[in-house]
């Protein structure tokens, strides 16, 4: 498939969706390309039920609600959407009147010519960060091992081990502590990389006995047969 567009947006997460809105106000047509099979980026793929508190004018909304609002916002404007497509090459082409355009090709055979490319891919296509010293953690995938939280209800009244020291680990520790039977937060360092406010909330939960904090530890082994039954640190 070959076509031309005013603006090609690589990444259909919140920034990519808002780019369609801003371009629409200028009367420009956008084409969105994303490696995932849905719009919303990490908000939809990794933590659709995660509360977001830092959107101006919106006290609180979930990540999926934020994506849904952006989709609603761009409905008046014309745009094309190509999902499950990974950009593999971007080549400059100089026309006869000395104007540079770009030819973008995807792994599924799309070839798009455009004068403008907006790269809104965030950290890139999502790849799980697996424990480096576990031979095959994915053998328990969906049976005790998960790399994202699609539904908070799946973890209600469960004994949870959360590994990590960034925003996602801290955010989900605070959020799931409301409904989980127990939560153990494990990090290989004593220092955390997440927002200070969320870290303070986590430490309050530790002091009140709602979260068990284990640092500095790494996961050495996942125990179980068909399902996870425990871990070795």
Q: What spans do the regions from the language model cover?
A:
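A Rossmann-like FAD-binding core segment of flavoenzymes
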Residues: 74-106, 111-114, 178-233
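A general structural signal for well-ordered alpha-helical segments in protein cores
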Residues: 52, 67, 74, 127, ...
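Conserved FAD-binding subdomain of flavin-dependent enzymes
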Residues: 55-82
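Conserved N-terminal glycine-rich FAD pyrophosphate-binding loop of Rossmann-like flavoproteins
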Residues: 37-61, 195-201
